[in-house]
Amino acid sequence: MFNTMRKFCLLGMLALLLALLLAADPPLSAISYASSSKPSTGQNKIIVVSISQEELYAYDNGQLFISTPVATGRPDLPTPTGIYHIFNKYSPYTFISPWPVGSPYYYATVTANYAMEWAQGGYFLHDAPWRGYFGKGANNWHKDPLMGEDPGTHGCINTPTAVMAQIYHWATIGTTLQINA
């Protein structure tokens, strides 16, 4: 009986440890590739975004290429998590609000220098020259030096322009984008 209880406790502890490991963001040196779907190009490149840390890490053949703080979706318009692939690239790209004037989500027309689309519905990884703050807390109400009070993006992933130029020229159509909570 004692051995049975001991085995049961050990299995429970192992299950808890596995659940905790699966829920955590990957360490900077680890890359988790999608096993079910390989892109046709960009196979050795992956962009990993941590929403909780508001950070982006781009890897080339397992080596860190570039990292940067980002701004992601506000609580009521969150950035979706999951595995995606870049399927369109634009330079420049003009964003026009799909929401009418007067909507709490309306925004004035803006142009990004570099934009890469990764999900239907207008989800892009792009620079945001109008934004002055990137990093932890950028996806909740905060004081932005260029925008004033800001709640985060409308679901896109924003980066500083200089960094986005490098990512844009490095990434190819098909590059994997992994977005973690």
Residue ranges with predicted function:
Residues 8-9, 23, 87:
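Small/flexible residues
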